Structure formats: C-alpha cells, structure tokens
Amino acid sequence: MRSPNAKRTRCAQALAGLTIAVLACTSYGADWIVSGNDGKYQRVEGRDTYPDNPKPDTLTLLDASRFPPQVKVQVEVENGIQGPPQAVAITPDANIALVGAPTRYDYAAKKLLMDSFVQVVDLQASPPVVARLDIGSHPQGIAIDRSGRLALVACVDGSVAVLGIDGNRVTLRDTLKIAQKRLAGVSFTHDGRHALVALRDEQGVAVLNVDDGRVTDSGLRLASGVAPYTIDVSSDGKWAVVSDVGLAGLPSYAGKLAGDADDVTLIDVSHEPFRAVQHVTVPSLPEGVAISPDGKWIGVQAMDGSNLTPDNPGRHARGKVVLFAIRDGQAVKVSEAPGGEAAQGIAFTADSKYLIVQFNVEKQLAFFAVNGGHLRDTGQRIALSGGPSSLRTTPR
C-alpha cells in the first residue's frame, strides 16, 4: 500500500523548482487554469477499473496566456472522477487552489471510499502545501468568487459549504442546506451577488443570494433537463449554461442506456428573476460546459456513447466537442469536432480563442481552436500522469 504522505512529500520536493518559477511570475497577464487528475481510476472500454500500483492523484496548474499553454506546477492531492468535472477552483491571484471529490480505493474490499474534506493547496509555498478542511460531507462542485474571498462547495448531502478565504487561510463559515439529495456544479454570477447550484437528483437549479459574504437560499428554482450537472456563467453578466446529463446521472439508475441525446439549458441572468430560456439538444452525457469570456460561444464536451461498453449499440469510440454561438438570445449550433473517449471538463482560455478539453481515458489535455465558429482540433496535447477529471479557470 502506498503512503500518500510520503509520496506527496517526494513529489512536492521534486516540483519545488517549478513552484519558484511560478513565484517569479505575477498573476498579471497570466491565464491560470487548474486540472484535477485521478491517477487510480482507468476506464477500459466503458468499464470501471482500478489497476494495482496506481499513480497518485494530482492537481496541475497551467498558464494559458500563450499558446500552447504551459504546465507550471503539479502537486499530489486526493481527487476522483466521480461527480461533475468542476471539483477544483483557483483564486484570482493563483495563490490558493481548492480541490474536492477526494476519493480512495480500498483494494482489499474492492470499494471506493469518499472523504468529506476540501483540500487547500497553497501554490505560493515552496514546495506547495496541501491542507485539509473537513466540511462534513463529500464535496463535488467548487466555485470561488471574483473577489477571491468567498468559496462555495456543493455536497452530496444537499448542503452548500460556505468557505471564507483570507490570504492562504481557508475556513468553514457556514453550511446551507438547500436539498435532500446530491448537488453537483456551482458557479457565481459575474457580479458576485448570486450563485447557481445544480440540484442533480431533485432536478432544477437553485439560486442563492450573496450579500457581503452571507449566503442564503433565495427560494427561486430554475428549470433544467434531467440531472443538471455542470454550470458556467458568462463574464458579461448575461448568461448561464447548465449541462444536463440525463438518466445516467441519476442515483443507482438500473436501466440500460444506449447513448440517448441529452441537453444543455441556457439561462438569462441579465436581470432578476433569472429564467431558463432554452433547452438545446446535445449528444449524450454532456459532462462539461463552458461559456467564452467574451460571451459569444458555448462549448460542450459530450461523451456521445464513448463511455459505453463495446456490446452496446450506442457505443462510439470518441465523444464530441460541440460549439454553439449565442445569437439574439438563443444558442445556435455552429460546429463540432471529434473529442476524446469518455472525456470530462471543458474551459475557454481567457482570450476566448481556444477550448481546453480533458481527455480522461487518454490522460491528456486537448486544445481546440474556436476560429470564429469553425472548431478545429489543434493537435496540441499535454500528457498527464492521471486521467483529468475536473477543470476550472480563475474567476472571470
């Protein structure tokens, strides 16, 4: 059995030089993005496996201000693929990263264990320091506001953990119960006055009020498709988008699925009350969704049957990356390209020119050019030691 603490120490020491390089840079001009990577899990033709002698889970820090993006830091953490690919977050100054979805695999019992802490990664320490903050339930989606002082964590028990950030110190301020079952993704609105939370098992999207660090449930619920999962909000303050992963995202669903189409929900957040205005059909299991910082594009990463076993008629070898334009208040499909096998998260670079997609099975980050609405795989890849499973940019 590997010793997580010993391995974490060795990895941190080896990466000290990289951390110093980051310390030499300022956040000005950088485009910081974090990827959480599951080293213990491997999907093999649609089947979950946990190979012996796994590599550690990791957090990778990228600077995407130039193309191709560059890896600046990698540090060992505890992170799993189970849940929405938004279980990481990073402060605007890139000093602190938060990591959720902590999982361990018990090889003797052949059972996955889920922990109830958020990891606080001090990226400015040399080597990086990882601390744990218990929040009482298994954390899924994480979001940090643009001030860098407040974070929200959506949990599997239906609660939202409210975290305060002061320098490199993170504390649990409050726990807000908004549902009885699992939550998934969470995102702040651009002005920081609200947050949207995906009610994965109970359906719909909850709207929270945020006032000077105090978070309350507004009581407003927005329509979604089945099993709302990931959420992103545009930097122009106009739109939010939610991926709805369908029956496959419901708890203990026992039926056989053959890659049915799912959908993405477009929400108008330009004025209150917020309102869902469109449900757009996409290929099955849209794990990741993102809105470009300039508010023009929506990127969707859909598995499209690439998560299914070879005997399933809905099986495809690769998923799809789909691009929509936002025109006259509606999302219009303009392009698509082959993606990875059972891929996960997706994010735009700060200049809105590229999409970063997590190719989980291939253990790669892939880069697609938006090209004015003509999606193109650049062929650029960043190899990772584990399957990438969560992806977030700094708050924009």
Walk through the language-model features, giving the residues of each.
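Predominantly soluble domains enriched in secretory-pathway, periplasmic, or organellar proteins
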Residues: 25-396
